Amino acid sequence: TDIGGGLDVGGGLRGGLDIDAKGPDVDIKGPKVGGDISGPDLDVSGPDLDIDGGGKKGKGGFGFGLKMPKFGFGGHGKGDIDVDADVDIERPDLDVSGDADLPSGGVGLDVGGGIGGGLGGGLDIDANGPDVDIKGPKVGGDISGPDLDVSGPDLDIDVDGKKKGKGGFGFGMKMPKFGFGGHGKGDIDVDADVDIERPDLDVSGDADLPSGGVGLDVGGGIGGGLGGGLDIDANGPDVDIKGPKVGGDISGPDLDVSGPDLDIDVDGKKKGKGGFGFGLKIPKFMDPTFGFGGHGKGDIDVDADGGVVIPEGDIKVKTGKPDIGGDVDLPSGGVDLDVGGGIGGGLGGGLDIDAKGPDVDIKGPRVGGDISGPDLDVSGPDLDIDGDGKKKGKGGFGFGLKMPKFGFGGHGKGDIDVDADVDIERPDLNVSG
């Protein structure tokens, strides 16, 4: 009798002749890679301003001018926070082979490589391939950009102007261009390169059973398993392979940059035709070194008028490729069964043959992690302004507040770019049994 068919994922062989040939149990676990790769905690806050100005009376005027200096951390220099972690773990090239040879007898079974196969008939043959449990590495980690807290200055301004006459009261405050801008280049670069490959492993086991009523030849692979009335049990070795555990914490520095606290109390008294004038001008608040603008290179990348760029996290994880194949050969006898490879198909007939492929548990590596941009807290200045103008006459009271260009905008390039490149390849696995 000649039976040929496609291979089924599953299936089994059953019959009155009981032959049980089991390949090796193979349990392969890749390394666990855990880590915390985080950029710096960045806290940048502008100055706290508390200004109290009072001006009184007469034809004259009161003038107050406050001009903040260029308050910066920089220059044209180059500064960067660079966290570079290179982890290289090599996986095994795994070669597991087990031979179970039963010489010729009444039944001949030839199972080509595949993932199973299902045939039914009156003769009960149970062929089980090896149990293969392959687990890739667990890669867990927390890759996060910096915690960025950027806040403008706290402003508390109390202005009281009382006046008689033709003059007027005027208040003007002009905030600066307070932004993270400029033409410079800045970045926080967290580059984590994880390359995981398994070690070379060669496990072989031979089980030879002399001639009898059934001929069984089990080549390597993920296929095969025979059972019948004649009890033959050939077990390959149990193989348990665990890769190394790699854990780490890679974190950038905590960076806290804060401007000065400014408390200004101004009282101006004057007589004359003029009026009362108050002017607050804060300069351009830049920091090229730390990325707050300017033309320099500053490598905490808050780029181009407030562009906030998360560190480009580049994470690469590589593992090897499995190569699993096998042949189960039973020499010729009363029945000749040839099952070709494939992932489908099942044949049924009066002859009960149940061919089971191996229990194959292949788990790729678990790549877990938290890849998140920074906790970004950007707040404009807190403004507490109390202006009281009382007046008699033709004059007027004027109050002007002009907020700056405060934002993450402009023509520059600002993005949150988290680039995680995970390249996972299975180990070179050669299992034959």
From Swiss-Prot:
Show the segment(s) annotated as Disordered: 366-389, 411-433
Q: Where is the composition biased (Basic and acidic residues)?
A: 423-433
One GO cellular component term, please give it: nucleus
Major subcellular site: membrane
Classification via InterPro entries: Myelin_sheath_structural
Q: Which UniProt keywords apply?
A: Developmental protein, Endoplasmic reticulum, Membrane, Microsome, Nucleus, Repeat, RNA-binding
In which ranges do the sequence repeats occur? 112-122, 219-229, 340-350
Q: What does this protein do?
A: May function as a multidomain RNA-binding protein. May play a role in nuclear RNA processing and in early development.
Name of the protein this chain belongs to: Vesicle-associated protein
Q: Give the species.
A: Strongylocentrotus purpuratus (Purple sea urchin)
Gene this chain is encoded by: VAP-1
